[in-house]
């Protein structure tokens, strides 16, 4: 029987998993410096969690959800995005209570699942990095979230990215805009795509996100939400924009930006990368916004919230083109070679001691001939080769060779007890 991975999935092998680890660690370090803490939620939830949060008319729910009935008759779905599960955890664990400092800031790095057409940077099992902040309705919470996304892309070395930003206002604004869109699209309903005709009666905002060719002729003249904003929404949006101006963050006010999920309210944003070697037009790598009613939707108290998500597959595609130096294999610090009776266990001890000091170290578990051990040291990219023979073992010494220039050093076993002392002797 030939076993293959399912369509739309990939094996992240050791030769590339280190690249993923580096990207994720960069994100973790940045989020922790901003006092965000990791949260881990189940990879599957009750179907209603996602159908209610994402919207029954969203592509995610209508076309892309992996859902099934389990053996207990429960309607279950694999998570298609990260926010809904985090909100459910926030409510179920009563994190809205006084025992938790607000805003409550978390991040996650996890696998998601959507039934999409597999293509470069997009798979049916994909990985997402995200942040969520609960409890503050202040404009600086929006600014902070946008800055985290901006700074992460900068730290990773992403080039030619641009912030697109818009606001959806509050529920009253959205209702007025909803009615305006219905009035605009109804006379041309028969000329719209099948999906947009269906959405017109449920959520016409989704039409603005349509990629269907037959819809494009109507989108440019569609009503703009900025014309329906109340004074409070305008003032809040202008505060966010003014803050970004003062902080030197460039942006484009994008009237067509609506985001693909129904739970967004207030400010929404996307970071788009313009790279002709990857895509014909600028493409989104990070997106998010404010969702002030989702906690209430899941029977929690009124709680403002804001967050964003990044698709790792697409991000990795960008970095492989724009910052390949980030993914260069750094090799290991030490490879311990040994020959002679009694040197095998000492080689193990030396490797463990070096690891305890924070170095990466490997020895030859196959105990091959010395020449073969040196070849392996070269193949794994060792910076230093430690040679341990019967003579060195008897004298309590080690010979260390720096492969970059061939310089050799003689060390005592006791030199391995202190990292600073060791470095002073081999980095001359």
Swiss-Prot record:
Listed under subunit, the entry gives: Homodimer.
Query: What span is annotated as the signal peptide, if there is one?
Result: none
What is the superkingdom listed in this entry's lineage? Answer: Bacteria
Q: What Pfam families does its record include? A: HGTP_anticodon (PF03129), tRNA-synt_His (PF13393)
Its EC number is 6.1.1.21
Could you provide one GO biological process annotation from this protein's UniProt record?
histidyl-tRNA aminoacylation
**Gene Ontology molecular function: any one:** catalytic activity, acting on a protein
Q: Which PANTHER family match?
A: HISTIDINE--TRNA LIGASE, MITOCHONDRIAL-RELATED (PTHR43707:SF1), HISTIDYL-TRNA SYNTHETASE (PTHR43707)
Q: Which UniProt keywords apply?
A: Aminoacyl-tRNA synthetase, ATP-binding, Cytoplasm, Ligase, Nucleotide-binding, Protein biosynthesis
What gene codes for this chain?
hisS
Q: What class of enzyme is it?
A: ligase
Cellular component (GO) terms are: cytoplasm
HAMAP family, alphabetized: His_tRNA_synth (MF_00127)
- What is its subcellular localisation? Cytoplasm
InterPro entries (alphabetical):
aa-tRNA-synth_II, aa-tRNA-synth_II/BPL/LPL, Anticodon-bd, Anticodon-bd_dom_sf, His-tRNA-ligase, HisRS-like_core, HisRS/HisZ, HisRS_anticodon
List the catalytic activities from the record.
tRNA(His) + L-histidine + ATP = L-histidyl-tRNA(His) + AMP + diphosphate + H(+)
Name the protein family.
Answer: Belongs to the class-II aminoacyl-tRNA synthetase family.
Q: Could you tell me what this protein is called?
A: Histidine--tRNA ligase
